[in-house]
């Protein structure tokens, strides 16, 4: 299975965010996307995930036999955590488990994986920033999807939790998964590809 983007271009209003951007990602590979805030990292992730349409170019996920829709083969983690604030942690994860179908792990199991089993009955909105992010990442473990598309996945995470998440990311890669992450901080595992978005600005903006 290969995930690729070819000559991607995106706009914000009338301004070009990036252009001519291509990549190719294979199983067990990590690709990071870097650049200052506002340059288009989140837009690129949403294009790859099938949430936005590129102004030019295309994204495909395929193997030797068929082409797959990226949206149904990926877990997308945006800057927001996609949890209902007044539901308990366990109720949120049970909702997502039912939504995904084909459960790989139970909500209780994924809470143990991220070291937060003792918070299962706590309302999501009273958690710390780092705890909320860990719960959001636990959601990815409920059902297997080969492609993880992550927007600042370790933002607000302390060093202990970063070690836990590094192990989770590495395990996903070892199982044949792929990860694309926009991040200001290293994920703690070797990256196979790195996209520096400044390199894909229009020529006049590169000069500035």
UniProtKB/Swiss-Prot annotation:
First-listed, main subcellular location of the protein, grouped into a coarse class: membrane
EC code(s) of this entry: 7.6.2.5
Membrane topology: Peripheral membrane protein
SUPFAM superfamilies membership: P-loop containing nucleoside triphosphate hydrolases
GO molecular function, one term: ATP hydrolysis activity
Residues that coordinate or bind ATP: 35-42
Location relative to the cell: Cell inner membrane
Family of this protein: Belongs to the ABC transporter superfamily. CcmA exporter (TC 3.A.1.107) family.
Record's subunit section: The complex is composed of two ATP-binding proteins (CcmA) and two transmembrane proteins (CcmB).
Role of this protein: Part of the ABC transporter complex CcmAB involved in the biogenesis of c-type cytochromes; once thought to export heme, this seems not to be the case, but its exact role is uncertain. Responsible for energy coupling to the transport system.
PANTHER family: ABC TRANSPORTER I FAMILY MEMBER 1 (PTHR43499:SF1)
Name the record gives this protein: Cytochrome c biogenesis ATP-binding export protein CcmA
Gene name of the record: ccmA
